């Protein structure tokens, strides 16, 4: 018996919607990253993108534990000398709530072209409304 290897053209991808309201950031992000990679499927193959599409709603209602609201800092750099910028969780969730979940999940995916393809299947929205109703996403609870 030969080992099964998934082919990119035969992969079946489903759409799922996840409600982030009241969820813990890290625990939700690990589940989403695992689903984006396709590790929950029996036909998972490391070098093929077998993951599903994930739509996250209510990103503005995500929570973190402890004092991370003020202590967790996100850094970005322009590439120029002295071009480092920082913003804490509290300000980022008020400014761009989608980026909090996107950053957490992106850090859990592979840092290569395949990981970038997986990341493109993640859709995050601050409120409860999303434009992907035509795909008929199934509700996913963690």
From Swiss-Prot:
InterPro entries: Ribosomal_uL13, Ribosomal_uL13_bac-type, Ribosomal_uL13_CS, Ribosomal_uL13_sf. GO terms for molecular function: mRNA binding; structural constituent of ribosome. GO terms for biological process: negative regulation of translation; translation. The keyword Ribosomal protein applies. CDD domains: Ribosomal_L13. Keywords: Ribonucleoprotein, Ribosomal protein. Pfam families: Ribosomal_L13. One of its GO terms (cellular component) is cytosolic large ribosomal subunit. PROSITE patterns: RIBOSOMAL_L13. Part of the 50S ribosomal subunit. PANTHER family: LARGE RIBOSOMAL SUBUNIT PROTEIN UL13M (PTHR11545:SF2), RIBOSOMAL PROTEIN L13 (PTHR11545). HAMAP family: Ribosomal_uL13. This protein is one of the early assembly proteins of the 50S ribosomal subunit, although it is not seen to bind rRNA by itself. It is important during the early stages of 50S assembly. Belongs to the universal ribosomal protein uL13 family. This is Large ribosomal subunit protein uL13. The gene is rplM.
């Amino acid at each position: 018996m030969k080992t099964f290897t998934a082919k990119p053209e035969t992969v079946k991808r489903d759409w799922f919607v996840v409600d982030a309201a009241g969820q813990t950031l890290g625990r939700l992000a690990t589940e989403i990253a695992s689903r984006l990679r396709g590790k929950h499927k029996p036909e998972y193959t490391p070098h093929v993108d077998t993951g599903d599409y994930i739509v996250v709603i209510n990103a503005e209602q995500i929570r973190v534990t402890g004092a991370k609201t003020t202590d967790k800092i996100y850094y970005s750099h322009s590439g120029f000398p002295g071009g480092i910028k920082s913003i804490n969780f509290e300000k980022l969730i008020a400014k761009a709530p989608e980026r909090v979940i996107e950053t957490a999940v992106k850090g859990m995916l592979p840092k290569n072209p395949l990981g970038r393809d997986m990341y493109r299947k993640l859709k995050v929205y601050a409120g409860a409304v999303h434009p992907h109703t035509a795909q008929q996403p199934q509700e996913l609870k963690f």
